[in-house]
Regions:
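N-terminal capping segments
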Residues: 1-73
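A broad, low-specificity signal marking well-ordered, structured residues that form hydrophobic/aromatic
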Residues: 12-14, 129, 151
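...with weaker cross-activation on analogous glycine-rich loops/strands in unrelated enzymes
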Residues: 61-134
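Contiguous ligand/interfacial binding patches
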Residues: 138
């Protein structure tokens, strides 16, 4: 059964503030191959929702750098998923900037009319929107300090989830346990991944195959 639940904005903000200037070892970092900003925002939204969507190609999930949905790391793909998602996972809509809330997502457009950068709102103070981002790393940076042609606000309205798979992921995301220290002689490649709950296979991708990585 598919039900709806609240998007926990404070958790998304707490995660964004913790990892704006450092990297969570659970996730690959895409700097140098397009940018890490949408990857970072996806992590933050996951912290507030704890539900991925494992539909191949069109879902929103991360298993490894080579097993992830385009929407996890691509600016336009992220937008397409969030505003069109009718299945499990977070979902939202575009709203005026005046209706923005903490935990919502902002995407910036350049002079070529391309949306190129993804940010997450962490505070609204006296009318000033503060954001966290990667590539360039920013912690509670005023939105007014960015240069852009236009922007869009993706308001996360809620989260759909399958009652068979209810997980509170926040603590394991926010403060992941350290892996055990293994002597070099005993180390083996750690490329095995847990399959998605629905059992569907996920085709491997190279980090650059999912389009714009920002």
């Amino acid at each position: 059964m598919i039900l709806k639940k609240e998007y926990l904005r404070e958790r998304a903000v707490a995660y964004a503030r913790k990892y704006a200037l450092v990297r969570n070892p659970l996730f690959y970092t895409f700097e140098g191959i397009g940018g890490n900003c949408t990857n970072f925002v996806s992590q933050s939204v996951l912290a507030g929702s704890c539900v991925m969507n494992f539909i191949p190609i069109y879902g929103w999930f991360y298993l490894s750098s080579n097993r992830r949905a385009p929407a996890w790391t691509g600016v336009q793909f992220f937008y397409n998923f969030m505003v069109n998602n009718l299945d499990v996972g977070p979902y939202g809509s575009v709203v005026p900037i005046e209706q923005a809330q903490i935990g919502d997502v902002i995407q910036l457009q350049n002079n070529d009319d391309v949306y190129y950068h993804t940010l997450i709102i962490t505070e609204i103070r006296d009318g000033e929107i503060l954001i966290c981002a990667n590539s360039v790393d920013s912690l509670d940076r005023p939105l007014s300090t960015y240069e852009y042609k236009s922007l869009r606000v993706i308001h996360i309205e809620g989260v759909r989830y399958d009652t068979r798979y209810v997980v509170d992921c926040f603590e394991s995301l926010y403060d992941p346990p350290l892996p055990p220290i293994t002597p070099p002689s005993e180390q083996t490649p750690s490329n095995e991944e847990v399959p998605p709950p629905n059992g569907e296979s996920i085709e491997e991708q190279t980090p650059s195959e999912t389009g714009e990585e920002e």
